[in-house]
Design a protein with these regions (language model features):
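Solvent-exposed loop/turn segments at secondary-structure junctions
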Residues: 112-116, 131-134, 174-178, 203-207
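Positively charged, proline/Ser/Thr-rich regional signature most characteristic
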Residues: 74-166, 217
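Flexible, polar/low-complexity N-terminal or interdomain linker segments that lie immediately upstream
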Residues: 23-118
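Bacterial N-terminal signal peptides that target proteins for export
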Residues: 1-9
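Bacterial N-terminal signal peptides
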Residues: 8-16
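Catalytic cysteine-centered active loop of the rhodanese-like fold, especially the PTP/DSP P-loop
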Residues: 145-204
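Active-site neighborhoods of enzymes that stabilize oxyanions during catalysis
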Residues: 210-219
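N-terminal signal peptide c-region/cleavage motif recognized by signal peptidases
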Residues: 18-20
């Protein structure tokens, strides 16, 4: 009798899980106030949201914990003085602003094309780290074209003027990847203002681990 009474009390107060809940009952938002965000990718509207399957797991491409270091060494939180490090909510905010027509922002996937073929963050454009690295064959003319045509810098009597240059939000594979850090460090060498460079340190590793939408080249 006492056991029956105790069970009744626990059930009525919600202290026993009855097992009736399903994954469909538990939506997965980006934040408490944001379920999804719509951005432009390849001229099309793409909805960024998290995988709604509560049983989803990490994809194999980012399941490794121990890539050899070097070269895959853990990157610091502060990459360089003046460079702001972003999380997921912040990069989504930049993506939304860019998609709404703010052309002062450019979100850059710094990875080589073979990585990008596997998927990227919707709204990002690919400018591989090798394209800005003289040590990897990038010549002054091609670097200059990127500065002028993609980043909005201007050349004045042989010197770069970054007054109207875009705010660049850069990422690569994650906290163990050196591709976006390489891009950022080269830009700083070229005189690009640190306050106009943002870094999403978590990159594709964190993005995919959180089940956020990934854009494939065909999408």
């Amino acid at each position: 009798m006492k056991l029956k009474l105790l069970t009744t009390i626990l059930l009525t107060t919600g202290l026993i899980w009855t097992g009736t809940g399903t994954a469909a009952d538990k939506p997965v938002g980006i934040s408490a106030s944001m379920m999804d965000a719509t951005v432009k990718h390849g001229g099309k509207s793409v909805k960024i949201m998290r995988d709604q399957n509560n049983k989803a797991v990490v994809i194999p491409a980012f399941a490794k914990t121990s890539r050899p270091c070097p070269p895959f060494c853990i990157q610091p939180i502060v990459l360089a003085p003046g460079i702001e490090t972003l999380g997921e909510n912040e990069i989504i905010d930049y993506l939304v602003k860019m998609s709404k027509g703010d052309d002062s922002i450019l979100v850059v996937d710094s990875r080589t094309p073979d990585w990008v073929q596997k998927g990227t963050i919707p709204g990002a454009v690919n400018i591989p780290w090798t394209a800005l690295n003289p040590a990897k064959g990038a010549d002054p003319i091609s670097i200059g074209e990127i500065m002028l045509d993609r980043f909005g810098a201007t050349s004045l009597e042989g010197l770069w003027d970054y007054s109207n240059a875009k705010t660049l939000v850069m990422f690569c594979n994650g906290m163990w990847c050196g591709q976006s850090p390489n891009n950022i460090k080269n830009l700083l060498k070229f005189g690009y203002p640190a306050h106009k460079i943002k870094w999403y340190r978590g990159g594709m590793q964190n993005w995919s681990n959180l089940g956020l939408t990934i854009a494939k080249p065909s999408s």
